[in-house]
Amino acid sequence: MKSSLLVLPLLISMSSAAAAGLSVRFDEGAPKDRFTLTNSGECNLKQARVMLDLSSSKAGLIFDVTASGAGVEVFQPLEFVKGADKLSRIPQVRDGDNRLELSIAQLKKGESIAFTIDVDDTLGGQEIIVSDSEISGANIQLSAGSNKLSGTFGANAVASIDGIECSN
């Protein structure tokens, strides 16, 4: 019986596959808002796509990247401040867009990609300032190989995805 109990934890650890994970954090800033994507999993993310979708956010959020268009007052174009070299291409964002897709070439365990951009709400509140709770309901989708998972931003302005099995 004792030897069976000693072997059980070993069998459990052998049977659980390593999983990829992603955490996305939104930080309101003036004049630039910031998104930080961190590989929170146990393996590298390779050839992955991340879709940041603000269309279902509580405040109807949009990207404000030009002086004229859908945004309000201050605008800020998309600017990568960390990890741009982890992308296979830099995405294009138009004023008023509510989606942004990132094509990740490789993001190692613990590494981050961060970018700044202006985010405005469209529901007539304080449009140039987005509170943490206003991004709640927005989604992220992670596609890697045949796996596709999604996560939703909570009132804490964080969305997380876990559970994509690591590939070799």
Q: Which residues fall in each region the model found?
A:
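Short, solvent-exposed loop/turn segments enriched in Ser/Thr/Gly
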Residues: 28-34
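Structured domain cores in non-transmembrane regions
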Residues: 43-116
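Short edge beta-strand/loop segments characteristic of extracellular beta-sandwich folds
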Residues: 36-40
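Glycine-rich, aromatic-bearing surface loops/beta-hairpins
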Residues: 126-168
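Sec-dependent N-terminal signal peptides
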Residues: 4-14
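Solvent-exposed coil/turn segments that connect beta secondary-structure elements
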Residues: 29, 55-57, 120
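Low-complexity, acidic Ser/Thr/Pro/Gly-rich terminal tails and inter-domain linkers that flank the onset
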Residues: 17-28, 44
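Internal, hydrophobic beta-strand segments that form the core of beta-sheet-rich folds
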Residues: 100-103, 113-121, 132-140
